[in-house]
């Protein structure tokens, strides 16, 4: 009698039927059985059974199998047609009495790549990022997202008023709890833990990313932090500085109609300094644009600045200082004024009090610092108010610790990126944090696990006139190879030990439709290197640029 032995963890029945050639039938049975095993769903328990899973401080409110292309994010929304079948688990976590952290964990029914990807939040959070989760699960990852403990729009901070535990959840606890619970749910579903765990997000999500590296180094093997709002308290003091410059008496207010002229003047002064005239300020630190050059000679028009407007512009570029001249936060840089993600959205707004900066800075101080709905930003004192903000909120919200020794010791890799044309968060802040890590840990140690890539011409997390597509969070349109995709480069560094020394970024003819082709490609170089034109060839082709030493 021929006996078919065990295959993997499954023991096949004894083959008791002989064929004429003795054993061929058993071989056929084995082949069929192997096919069944290899094509069966790769999970340990049915998705729906996860509703009874017990986890600390956690209630699982739903566990359901979602058919391919069937998930609809809202009752009136359109289904995510390209998303494969997945197991959706919804849970609420209550680590503190006033906590109510909602998370969702999505796990591919088939084709799991053995990895977990945690996702963060922009602004004040308040919702789960379904589009990012859809991209992750479509690429084979088990993934998780959270509302960080409250419901609301990303520009609303009213939930924080009188709720210090919710501020802690938003600051760091929710992402860590999401990570722990997601890994436990993944283990229960597949019968195996993730082989690798990654976190990727931008803006406030970049702050969350650095918080994970600093406070919970065991959570993730690789972290991708975009445009991090990590010096949260001082960043929002900077917003108040800008608001006072523009709206203190309204004489300095710069209407959106004047922004294109400011942008043109900046480019005229600084665009060609890197040897290429391409509508991009390659490194704004090399630009010494003087707003006084735009002073109106007669009357006023959209093409010039009044004296109070020129002074307001200088203050915004300089950044906040106290009465002793000490810098509180880095100022805005030149080159990010115009465009959909420029100053009319973030700094000047479409009118006084109608900017995103007003929503975030005023919302923070009203609800998390002074806890007074009637507080007026014009009363803020830059000598005393900064300490008040730090004492009240820095412990929960700031992710500025440069000591990443524990993260390095566990083999973690961290990549930070920031657009040089970011009007929301000064890109100089990311350079400052990178430099403090290098100073704290030494350049040799820092180089083993940390990289910073600055993206000329890119606005906040994406968009802008420069090459802005390279696989960063919220921009899945880039190719997936490590040479063109910063997330894939992070994976390659973690899993193969190959550190990224150049990322090719693309500017599409249409940012919304890459099928129209590339308008420009350009290398992103690891800071402090910068891309320099070789002097010959098409300036729209990255092959004609090389990475050379730049300013630290």
What are these regions (language model features)?
Residues 416-418:
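Short beta-strand/loop motif that positions the catalytic acidic residue
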Residues 113, 123-191, 237-238, 376-386, ...:
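Cap/lid segment of the alpha/beta-hydrolase catalytic domain
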Residues 201, 205, 209:
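Gly/Ala-rich beta-loop-alpha elbow adjacent to hydrolase catalytic centers
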Residues 43-115, 130-131, 276-277, 281, ...:
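Catalytic-loop region of hydrolases
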Residues 193-202:
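Alpha/beta-hydrolase fold nucleophile elbow
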Residues 211-212, 218-321, 468-482:
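A catalytic-pocket lid/entrance helix-loop region that shapes and gates access to the active site
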Residues 27-39:
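Bacterial N-terminal signal peptides
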Residues 424-428:
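Conserved alpha/beta-hydrolase "acid-adjacent" motif
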């Amino acid at each position: 009698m021929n006996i078919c032995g065990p295959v993997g963890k499954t023991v096949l029945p004894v083959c008791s039927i002989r064929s004429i050639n003795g054993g061929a039938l058993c071989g056929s049975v084995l082949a069929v059985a192997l096919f069944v095993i290899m094509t069966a769903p790769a999970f340990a328990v049915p998705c729906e059974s996860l509703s009874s899973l017990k986890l600390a401080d956690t209630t699982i409110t739903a566990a359901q199998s979602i058919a391919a292309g069937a998930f609809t994010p809202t009752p009136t929304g359109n289904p995510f047609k390209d998303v494969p079948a997945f197991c959706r688990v919804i849970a609420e976590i209550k680590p503190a009495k006033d906590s109510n952290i909602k998370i969702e964990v999505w796990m591919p029914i088939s084709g799991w790549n053995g990895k977990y990807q945690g996702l963060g939040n922009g602004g004040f959070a308040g919702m789960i990022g379904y589009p990012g989760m859809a991209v992750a699960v479509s690429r084979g990852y088990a993934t998780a997202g959270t509302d960080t403990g409250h419901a609301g729009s990303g520009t609303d901070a009213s939930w924080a008023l009188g709720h210090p535990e919710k501020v802690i959840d938003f600051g760091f606890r929710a992402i860590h709890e999401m990570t722990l619970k997601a890994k436990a749910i993944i283990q229960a579903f597949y019968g195996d833990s993730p082989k690798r765990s990654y976190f990727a997000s931008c803006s406030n999500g970049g702050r969350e990313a650095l918080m994970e590296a600093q406070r919970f180094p065991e959570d993730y093997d690789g972290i991708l932090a975009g445009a991090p709002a990590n010096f949260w308290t001082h960043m929002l003091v900077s917003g108040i500085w800008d608001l006072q410059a523009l709206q203190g008496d309204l004489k300095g207010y710069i209407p959106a109609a004047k922004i294109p002229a400011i942008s043109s003047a900046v480019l005229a002064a600084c665009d060609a300094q890197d040897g290429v005239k391409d509508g991009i300020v390659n490194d704004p630190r090399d630009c010494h644009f003087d707003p006084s050059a735009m002073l109106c000679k007669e009357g006023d028009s959209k093409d010039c600045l009044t004296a109070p407007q020129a002074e307001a512009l200088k203050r915004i570029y300089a950044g906040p200082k106290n009465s002793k001249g000490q810098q509180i936060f880095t100022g805005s840089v030149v080159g990010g004024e115009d465009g959909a993600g420029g100053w009319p959205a973030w700094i000047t707004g479409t009118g006084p009090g109608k900017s995103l900066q007003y929503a975030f800075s005023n919302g923070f101080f009203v609800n998390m610092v002074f806890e007074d709905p009637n507080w007026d930003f014009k009363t803020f004192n830059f000598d005393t108010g900064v300490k008040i903000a730090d004492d009240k909120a820095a412990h929960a919200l700031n992710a500025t610790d440069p000591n990443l020794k524990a993260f390095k010791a566990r083999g973690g890799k961290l990549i930070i990126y920031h657009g040089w044309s970011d009007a929301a968060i000064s890109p100089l802040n990311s350079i400052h944090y990178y430099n403090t890590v290098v100073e704290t840990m030494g350049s040799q140690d820092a180089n083993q696990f940390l990289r910073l890539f600055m993206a000329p011409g890119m606005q906040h997390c994406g968009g802008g006139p420069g090459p802005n597509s390279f696989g960063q969070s919220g921009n899945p349109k880039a190719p997936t190879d490590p040479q063109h995709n910063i997330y894939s480069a992070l994976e390659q560094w973690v899993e193969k030990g190959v550190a990224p020394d150049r990322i090719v970024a693309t500017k599409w003819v249409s940012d919304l439709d890459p099928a129209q082709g590339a308008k420009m490609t350009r290398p992103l170089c690891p800071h402090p290197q910068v891309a320099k034109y070789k002097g010959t060839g098409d300036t729209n082709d990255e092959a004609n640029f090389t990475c050379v030493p730049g300013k630290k």
